[in-house]
Amino acid sequence: MNLNEMYQKMGIDNDVYTYGQKIADQKRGMELNETALRLWEMLEQPQTVEALTDKMAAYYEIPKEEQGELAKDIEAFVQELLVFGAVRRELGCPKGSCEGRLHIAGIKIEVYGEKGCIPKQFDAFRMTDGGNPEKAIPDLILELAERLPGSRQNGTILIRNRDLTVAIWEEGYVFRFDTLKNIYEIWMKEDGSYARIYYRCPINEEEQDSLFLAIRPVFLFLAQRRGMFALHSASLLYLEKAWLFSGPSGMGKSTHTALWKKLFATPFLNGDLNLIGKEGEKFVVYGIPWCGTSKIFTTEKKELGGIVLLEKAPSEELVSLTEEQKTLRVMQRMISPPWTAELMVKNLKFAEAVAKEKPVYFLRCTKNDTAAETIRRQIEEDEKRQKAGSDDCMKNMKKRIPKEQAQEDES
Protein backbone atom coordinates (compact mmCIF):
# COMPACT_ATOMS: atom_id res chain seq x y z
CA MET A 1 0.00 0.00 0.00
CA ASN A 2 1.02 3.59 -0.50
CA LEU A 3 -0.65 6.98 -0.60
CA ASN A 4 -2.52 8.25 -3.62
CA GLU A 5 -0.63 11.33 -4.79
CA MET A 6 -3.91 13.23 -5.23
CA TYR A 7 -4.29 13.45 -1.42
CA GLN A 8 -2.07 15.88 0.47
CA LYS A 9 -1.74 16.86 4.11
CA MET A 10 -1.34 20.63 4.17
CA GLY A 11 -0.38 22.87 7.07
CA ILE A 12 0.05 21.82 10.68
CA ASP A 13 -3.46 20.48 11.34
CA ASN A 14 -4.66 16.90 10.81
CA ASP A 15 -6.72 17.58 7.70
CA VAL A 16 -6.02 15.89 4.37
CA TYR A 17 -7.16 17.59 1.16
CA THR A 18 -7.76 16.43 -2.39
CA TYR A 19 -6.72 18.13 -5.61
CA GLY A 20 -6.50 17.49 -9.35
CA GLN A 21 -8.33 14.38 -10.57
CA LYS A 22 -9.68 13.69 -7.07
CA ILE A 23 -11.55 17.00 -7.19
CA ALA A 24 -12.96 16.01 -10.59
CA ASP A 25 -13.99 12.64 -9.11
CA GLN A 26 -15.74 14.55 -6.27
CA LYS A 27 -13.63 12.90 -3.56
CA ARG A 28 -13.74 14.62 -0.18
CA GLY A 29 -10.91 15.40 2.20
CA MET A 30 -10.73 13.87 5.67
CA GLU A 31 -9.68 14.60 9.24
CA LEU A 32 -7.23 12.21 10.91
CA ASN A 33 -6.82 11.43 14.61
CA GLU A 34 -3.37 10.94 16.14
CA THR A 35 -3.11 7.20 15.36
CA ALA A 36 -4.47 7.59 11.84
CA LEU A 37 -2.06 10.47 11.25
CA ARG A 38 0.91 8.29 12.21
CA LEU A 39 -0.28 5.54 9.85
CA TRP A 40 -0.73 8.15 7.13
CA GLU A 41 2.86 9.33 7.56
CA MET A 42 4.10 5.73 7.38
CA LEU A 43 2.21 5.25 4.13
CA GLU A 44 4.23 7.99 2.47
CA GLN A 45 6.47 5.04 1.58
CA PRO A 46 5.00 1.73 0.26
CA GLN A 47 4.10 -0.53 3.19
CA THR A 48 2.45 -3.88 3.79
CA VAL A 49 -0.20 -4.25 6.50
CA GLU A 50 2.23 -6.53 8.36
CA ALA A 51 4.95 -3.85 8.32
CA LEU A 52 2.49 -1.21 9.55
CA THR A 53 1.45 -3.51 12.40
CA ASP A 54 5.04 -4.11 13.48
CA LYS A 55 5.89 -0.40 13.42
CA MET A 56 2.77 0.65 15.33
CA ALA A 57 3.29 -2.11 17.90
CA ALA A 58 6.85 -0.92 18.47
CA TYR A 59 5.82 2.75 18.71
CA TYR A 60 3.02 2.16 21.22
CA GLU A 61 4.85 -0.73 22.97
CA ILE A 62 1.92 -3.10 22.48
CA PRO A 63 2.45 -6.61 23.94
CA LYS A 64 2.73 -9.55 21.55
CA GLU A 65 -0.56 -11.08 22.70
CA GLU A 66 -2.46 -7.90 21.76
CA GLN A 67 -0.92 -7.41 18.33
CA GLY A 68 -3.53 -9.62 16.65
CA GLU A 69 -6.25 -7.07 17.47
CA LEU A 70 -3.96 -4.25 16.37
CA ALA A 71 -3.47 -5.94 12.99
CA LYS A 72 -7.27 -6.19 12.54
CA ASP A 73 -7.71 -2.49 13.36
CA ILE A 74 -4.99 -1.46 10.92
CA GLU A 75 -6.45 -3.73 8.21
CA ALA A 76 -9.87 -2.11 8.73
CA PHE A 77 -8.36 1.40 8.54
CA VAL A 78 -6.46 0.55 5.36
CA GLN A 79 -9.63 -0.90 3.79
CA GLU A 80 -11.43 2.38 4.53
CA LEU A 81 -8.61 4.30 2.85
CA LEU A 82 -8.78 1.95 -0.16
CA VAL A 83 -12.53 2.48 -0.53
CA PHE A 84 -12.04 6.21 -0.10
CA GLY A 85 -9.32 6.18 -2.75
CA ALA A 86 -6.72 7.70 -0.43
CA VAL A 87 -4.33 4.75 -0.82
CA ARG A 88 -3.81 2.23 -3.57
CA ARG A 89 -2.29 -1.20 -3.75
CA GLU A 90 0.88 -1.16 -5.82
CA LEU A 91 0.81 -3.17 -9.01
CA GLY A 92 2.17 -6.63 -8.33
CA CYS A 93 -0.02 -7.43 -5.32
CA PRO A 94 -3.06 -9.39 -6.57
CA LYS A 95 -6.14 -9.62 -4.40
CA GLY A 96 -7.78 -13.00 -3.88
CA SER A 97 -6.70 -16.45 -4.99
CA CYS A 98 -5.39 -17.78 -8.29
CA GLU A 99 -8.38 -18.90 -10.35
CA GLY A 100 -6.40 -20.56 -13.11
CA ARG A 101 -3.24 -20.71 -15.19
CA LEU A 102 -2.96 -20.21 -18.93
CA HIS A 103 -0.21 -21.14 -21.38
CA ILE A 104 -0.30 -19.19 -24.65
CA ALA A 105 2.60 -19.12 -27.13
CA GLY A 106 5.04 -20.11 -24.40
CA ILE A 107 3.83 -17.34 -22.07
CA LYS A 108 2.60 -18.54 -18.67
CA ILE A 109 -0.21 -16.50 -17.12
CA GLU A 110 -1.68 -16.66 -13.60
CA VAL A 111 -5.19 -15.21 -13.30
CA TYR A 112 -6.53 -13.84 -10.00
CA GLY A 113 -10.13 -12.82 -9.42
CA GLU A 114 -13.62 -13.99 -8.55
CA LYS A 115 -14.60 -17.63 -9.06
CA GLY A 116 -15.39 -18.27 -12.73
CA CYS A 117 -13.84 -14.98 -13.86
CA ILE A 118 -11.68 -16.43 -16.66
CA PRO A 119 -13.40 -16.01 -20.05
CA LYS A 120 -14.42 -19.30 -21.69
CA GLN A 121 -12.35 -18.49 -24.79
CA PHE A 122 -9.23 -19.46 -22.79
CA ASP A 123 -10.45 -22.98 -21.94
CA ALA A 124 -8.21 -24.67 -24.53
CA PHE A 125 -5.15 -22.83 -23.15
CA ARG A 126 -5.54 -23.73 -19.46
CA MET A 127 -2.57 -25.33 -17.68
CA THR A 128 -2.76 -28.20 -15.21
CA ASP A 129 -1.19 -27.81 -11.76
CA GLY A 130 1.24 -30.67 -12.32
CA GLY A 131 4.86 -30.47 -13.43
CA ASN A 132 7.94 -28.72 -12.13
CA PRO A 133 6.91 -25.76 -9.90
CA GLU A 134 9.98 -23.83 -11.05
CA LYS A 135 8.80 -24.02 -14.65
CA ALA A 136 5.35 -22.82 -13.60
CA ILE A 137 6.61 -19.39 -12.50
CA PRO A 138 4.28 -16.99 -14.37
CA ASP A 139 5.46 -14.53 -16.99
CA LEU A 140 2.30 -12.49 -16.41
CA ILE A 141 0.12 -12.07 -13.32
CA LEU A 142 -3.32 -10.94 -14.41
CA GLU A 143 -5.70 -9.59 -11.75
CA LEU A 144 -9.35 -9.34 -12.78
CA ALA A 145 -10.76 -6.79 -10.32
CA GLU A 146 -14.55 -6.71 -10.41
CA ARG A 147 -14.87 -3.14 -9.13
CA LEU A 148 -14.25 0.48 -9.99
CA PRO A 149 -10.68 1.74 -9.56
CA GLY A 150 -10.19 3.86 -6.44
CA SER A 151 -9.25 6.72 -8.74
CA ARG A 152 -8.64 7.25 -12.43
CA GLN A 153 -4.96 7.27 -13.31
CA ASN A 154 -3.88 10.13 -15.54
CA GLY A 155 -0.68 10.18 -17.52
CA THR A 156 0.87 11.11 -20.83
CA ILE A 157 -1.35 9.87 -23.65
CA LEU A 158 0.58 7.78 -26.18
CA ILE A 159 -2.28 6.86 -28.53
CA ARG A 160 -6.00 7.51 -28.67
CA ASN A 161 -8.52 6.16 -31.15
CA ARG A 162 -12.14 5.06 -31.16
CA ASP A 163 -11.35 1.72 -29.54
CA LEU A 164 -8.38 2.29 -27.25
CA THR A 165 -6.54 4.99 -25.31
CA VAL A 166 -3.07 4.21 -23.93
CA ALA A 167 -1.33 6.49 -21.43
CA ILE A 168 1.96 6.08 -19.58
CA TRP A 169 2.21 6.88 -15.86
CA GLU A 170 4.62 6.33 -12.96
CA GLU A 171 4.08 2.56 -12.68
CA GLY A 172 3.54 1.68 -16.32
CA TYR A 173 0.59 1.95 -18.68
CA VAL A 174 -3.14 2.68 -18.42
CA PHE A 175 -5.60 1.37 -21.04
CA ARG A 176 -9.14 2.66 -21.55
CA PHE A 177 -11.69 1.20 -23.97
CA ASP A 178 -14.52 3.49 -25.09
CA THR A 179 -16.30 0.67 -26.93
CA LEU A 180 -16.06 -1.97 -24.16
CA LYS A 181 -18.68 -0.64 -21.77
CA ASN A 182 -18.00 -2.94 -18.80
CA ILE A 183 -14.21 -2.43 -18.83
CA TYR A 184 -13.25 0.54 -16.65
CA GLU A 185 -9.45 0.63 -16.92
CA ILE A 186 -6.39 -1.59 -17.17
CA TRP A 187 -3.25 -0.77 -15.19
CA MET A 188 -0.14 -2.59 -16.44
CA LYS A 189 3.44 -2.54 -15.18
CA GLU A 190 6.01 -1.11 -17.55
CA ASP A 191 7.61 -4.51 -18.18
CA GLY A 192 4.24 -6.20 -18.85
CA SER A 193 4.68 -8.70 -16.00
CA TYR A 194 1.54 -7.61 -14.11
CA ALA A 195 -1.79 -6.15 -15.16
CA ARG A 196 -4.94 -5.30 -13.23
CA ILE A 197 -8.22 -5.07 -15.15
CA TYR A 198 -11.01 -3.11 -13.47
CA TYR A 199 -14.35 -4.25 -14.84
CA ARG A 200 -18.05 -4.67 -14.13
CA CYS A 201 -19.54 -8.15 -13.96
CA PRO A 202 -20.79 -9.01 -17.48
CA ILE A 203 -24.57 -8.99 -17.88
CA ASN A 204 -24.71 -10.46 -21.39
CA GLU A 205 -22.58 -12.39 -23.87
CA GLU A 206 -21.24 -9.22 -25.50
CA GLU A 207 -19.85 -8.02 -22.17
CA GLN A 208 -18.37 -11.45 -21.47
CA ASP A 209 -16.49 -11.15 -24.77
CA SER A 210 -15.32 -7.65 -23.77
CA LEU A 211 -13.16 -9.00 -20.94
CA PHE A 212 -11.56 -11.50 -23.34
CA LEU A 213 -10.84 -8.71 -25.84
CA ALA A 214 -9.46 -6.36 -23.16
CA ILE A 215 -6.79 -8.90 -22.23
CA ARG A 216 -5.43 -8.95 -25.80
CA PRO A 217 -3.32 -5.73 -25.72
CA VAL A 218 -1.77 -6.82 -22.43
CA PHE A 219 -0.76 -10.16 -23.94
CA LEU A 220 0.46 -8.66 -27.22
CA PHE A 221 2.66 -6.17 -25.33
CA LEU A 222 4.36 -8.95 -23.37
CA ALA A 223 4.61 -11.13 -26.50
CA GLN A 224 6.35 -8.26 -28.30
CA ARG A 225 8.88 -8.02 -25.46
CA ARG A 226 9.50 -11.75 -25.97
CA GLY A 227 10.13 -11.32 -29.72
CA MET A 228 6.67 -12.38 -30.95
CA PHE A 229 4.62 -10.14 -33.21
CA ALA A 230 0.97 -10.20 -34.28
CA LEU A 231 -0.15 -9.95 -37.91
CA HIS A 232 -3.78 -9.23 -38.82
CA SER A 233 -4.33 -12.20 -41.10
CA ALA A 234 -6.15 -15.48 -41.69
CA SER A 235 -4.02 -18.60 -41.78
CA LEU A 236 -4.15 -22.16 -43.07
CA LEU A 237 -1.94 -25.24 -43.09
CA TYR A 238 -0.38 -26.26 -46.40
CA LEU A 239 2.72 -28.41 -47.04
CA GLU A 240 2.99 -28.73 -43.24
CA LYS A 241 3.53 -24.97 -42.89
CA ALA A 242 1.39 -22.01 -41.85
CA TRP A 243 0.53 -19.59 -44.66
CA LEU A 244 -0.83 -16.18 -43.67
CA PHE A 245 -3.23 -14.19 -45.86
CA SER A 246 -3.55 -10.50 -45.07
CA GLY A 247 -5.13 -7.45 -46.62
CA PRO A 248 -7.06 -4.26 -45.90
CA SER A 249 -10.36 -4.46 -44.03
CA GLY A 250 -13.05 -5.86 -46.30
CA MET A 251 -10.52 -7.42 -48.67
CA GLY A 252 -11.93 -10.88 -48.08
CA LYS A 253 -9.04 -12.81 -46.51
CA SER A 254 -11.54 -15.23 -44.95
CA THR A 255 -13.23 -15.65 -48.34
CA HIS A 256 -9.85 -16.42 -49.91
CA THR A 257 -8.86 -19.01 -47.30
CA ALA A 258 -12.32 -20.56 -47.71
CA LEU A 259 -11.44 -21.11 -51.40
CA TRP A 260 -8.38 -23.09 -50.31
CA LYS A 261 -10.53 -25.17 -47.96
CA LYS A 262 -13.01 -25.90 -50.75
CA LEU A 263 -10.45 -26.63 -53.50
CA PHE A 264 -7.54 -28.22 -51.62
CA ALA A 265 -9.02 -29.30 -48.25
CA THR A 266 -6.46 -27.23 -46.33
CA PRO A 267 -7.10 -26.98 -42.56
CA PHE A 268 -7.68 -23.52 -41.09
CA LEU A 269 -5.40 -22.32 -38.27
CA ASN A 270 -6.69 -18.87 -37.27
CA GLY A 271 -9.38 -16.75 -38.86
CA ASP A 272 -8.12 -13.27 -37.96
CA LEU A 273 -4.85 -12.95 -36.01
CA ASN A 274 -1.51 -14.75 -36.10
CA LEU A 275 1.44 -14.49 -33.73
CA ILE A 276 4.86 -14.94 -35.35
CA GLY A 277 8.15 -15.58 -33.58
CA LYS A 278 11.52 -17.15 -34.26
CA GLU A 279 12.94 -20.29 -32.70
CA GLY A 280 16.50 -20.97 -33.72
CA GLU A 281 16.68 -20.50 -37.48
CA LYS A 282 12.94 -20.96 -38.08
CA PHE A 283 10.05 -18.52 -38.02
CA VAL A 284 7.01 -20.09 -36.38
CA VAL A 285 3.34 -19.22 -35.94
CA TYR A 286 1.91 -19.79 -32.46
CA GLY A 287 -1.63 -20.78 -31.60
CA ILE A 288 -3.53 -18.01 -29.78
CA PRO A 289 -7.21 -17.71 -28.76
CA TRP A 290 -7.93 -14.31 -30.34
CA CYS A 291 -9.45 -14.86 -33.77
CA GLY A 292 -11.91 -12.03 -34.45
CA THR A 293 -15.46 -13.27 -34.96
CA SER A 294 -14.33 -16.34 -36.92
CA LYS A 295 -14.13 -18.74 -33.94
CA ILE A 296 -11.26 -20.39 -35.85
CA PHE A 297 -8.09 -20.88 -33.80
CA THR A 298 -5.56 -23.53 -32.84
CA THR A 299 -3.39 -24.23 -29.82
CA GLU A 300 -0.63 -25.67 -32.02
CA LYS A 301 2.62 -24.15 -33.25
CA LYS A 302 3.56 -24.40 -36.94
CA GLU A 303 6.53 -23.33 -39.03
CA LEU A 304 5.82 -20.18 -41.04
CA GLY A 305 5.64 -20.85 -44.78
CA GLY A 306 5.11 -17.28 -45.92
CA ILE A 307 2.77 -14.31 -46.13
CA VAL A 308 0.35 -13.48 -48.94
CA LEU A 309 -0.76 -9.85 -49.19
CA LEU A 310 -4.13 -9.56 -50.91
CA GLU A 311 -5.66 -6.73 -52.93
CA LYS A 312 -8.93 -6.63 -54.88
CA ALA A 313 -8.57 -6.62 -58.67
CA PRO A 314 -10.61 -7.57 -61.78
CA SER A 315 -8.20 -10.45 -62.53
CA GLU A 316 -5.42 -12.50 -60.93
CA GLU A 317 -1.93 -11.00 -60.91
CA LEU A 318 1.15 -11.71 -58.79
CA VAL A 319 3.06 -8.45 -58.36
CA SER A 320 6.78 -8.39 -57.57
CA LEU A 321 7.78 -6.27 -54.56
CA THR A 322 11.15 -4.91 -53.44
CA GLU A 323 12.49 -5.89 -50.01
CA GLU A 324 11.59 -2.43 -48.71
CA GLN A 325 8.02 -2.72 -50.03
CA LYS A 326 7.62 -6.15 -48.46
CA THR A 327 8.87 -4.85 -45.11
CA LEU A 328 6.58 -1.82 -45.15
CA ARG A 329 3.47 -3.76 -46.18
CA VAL A 330 4.03 -6.47 -43.58
CA MET A 331 4.58 -3.88 -40.85
CA GLN A 332 1.39 -2.05 -41.87
CA ARG A 333 -0.59 -5.24 -41.19
CA MET A 334 0.96 -5.80 -37.76
CA ILE A 335 -1.06 -4.95 -34.64
CA SER A 336 1.70 -5.35 -32.06
CA PRO A 337 1.90 -2.16 -29.95
CA PRO A 338 3.33 0.88 -31.83
CA TRP A 339 2.82 3.22 -28.85
CA THR A 340 6.37 4.59 -28.77
CA ALA A 341 9.24 5.04 -31.21
CA GLU A 342 11.06 2.15 -29.51
CA LEU A 343 8.11 -0.20 -29.98
CA MET A 344 7.65 0.89 -33.60
CA VAL A 345 11.32 0.14 -34.33
CA LYS A 346 10.82 -3.35 -32.87
CA ASN A 347 7.92 -3.92 -35.26
CA LEU A 348 9.92 -2.60 -38.21
CA LYS A 349 12.98 -4.78 -37.52
CA PHE A 350 10.87 -7.90 -37.16
CA ALA A 351 8.95 -7.18 -40.38
CA GLU A 352 12.30 -6.62 -42.10
CA ALA A 353 13.61 -9.99 -40.87
CA VAL A 354 10.49 -11.83 -42.02
CA ALA A 355 10.54 -10.15 -45.45
CA LYS A 356 14.21 -11.05 -45.88
CA GLU A 357 13.97 -14.72 -44.89
CA LYS A 358 10.45 -15.82 -45.87
CA PRO A 359 8.42 -15.42 -49.07
CA VAL A 360 6.10 -12.42 -49.09
CA TYR A 361 3.70 -12.44 -52.05
CA PHE A 362 1.49 -9.63 -53.31
CA LEU A 363 -1.59 -11.05 -55.03
CA ARG A 364 -4.04 -8.79 -56.82
CA CYS A 365 -7.07 -11.02 -57.22
CA THR A 366 -10.76 -11.72 -57.56
CA LYS A 367 -12.89 -13.86 -55.25
CA ASN A 368 -12.91 -16.69 -57.79
CA ASP A 369 -11.29 -20.12 -57.56
CA THR A 370 -8.52 -18.93 -59.89
CA ALA A 371 -7.21 -16.65 -57.12
CA ALA A 372 -6.39 -19.60 -54.85
CA GLU A 373 -5.09 -21.66 -57.77
CA THR A 374 -2.72 -18.85 -58.86
CA ILE A 375 -1.03 -18.37 -55.51
CA ARG A 376 -0.97 -22.09 -54.72
CA ARG A 377 0.89 -22.76 -57.96
CA GLN A 378 3.50 -20.13 -57.09
CA ILE A 379 3.92 -21.43 -53.55
CA GLU A 380 4.46 -25.00 -54.79
CA GLU A 381 7.09 -23.88 -57.31
CA ASP A 382 8.99 -21.90 -54.70
CA GLU A 383 8.80 -24.69 -52.10
CA LYS A 384 10.16 -27.23 -54.63
CA ARG A 385 12.97 -24.84 -55.55
CA GLN A 386 13.82 -24.30 -51.89
CA LYS A 387 13.81 -28.04 -51.17
CA ALA A 388 16.04 -28.71 -54.17
CA GLY A 389 18.47 -26.07 -52.95
CA SER A 390 18.52 -27.62 -49.47
CA ASP A 391 19.12 -31.10 -50.94
CA ASP A 392 22.04 -29.82 -53.04
CA CYS A 393 23.52 -28.17 -49.97
CA MET A 394 23.32 -31.45 -48.02
CA LYS A 395 24.97 -33.38 -50.89
CA ASN A 396 27.85 -30.90 -51.00
CA MET A 397 28.28 -31.20 -47.24
CA LYS A 398 28.47 -35.01 -47.51
CA LYS A 399 31.07 -34.75 -50.29
CA ARG A 400 33.25 -32.46 -48.20
CA ILE A 401 33.20 -34.60 -45.09
CA PRO A 402 35.20 -37.59 -46.49
CA LYS A 403 37.83 -35.23 -47.98
CA GLU A 404 38.23 -33.39 -44.69
CA GLN A 405 38.41 -36.73 -42.84
CA ALA A 406 41.11 -37.98 -45.23
CA GLN A 407 43.18 -34.84 -44.67
CA GLU A 408 42.96 -35.36 -40.92
CA ASP A 409 44.07 -39.02 -41.27
CA GLU A 410 47.11 -38.00 -43.36
CA SER A 411 48.15 -35.46 -40.76
Named regions from a protein language model:
Residues 1-6:
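Eukaryotic partner-binding/assembly regions in large regulatory complexes
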Residues 7-21, 25, 36-37, 55, ...:
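A noncatalytic interaction/capping subdomain that flanks phosphate/NTP-handling catalytic cores
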Residues 28, 41:
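Generic anion/oxyanion-binding catalytic loop in active/binding sites
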Residues 30-35:
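Short helix-coil-helix linker/hinge
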Residues 42-51:
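Short capping segments at the starts of secondary-structure elements
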Residues 253:
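Conserved lysine of the Walker
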Residues 256:
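Hydrophobic positions on the alpha1 helix immediately C-terminal to the Walker A/P-loop
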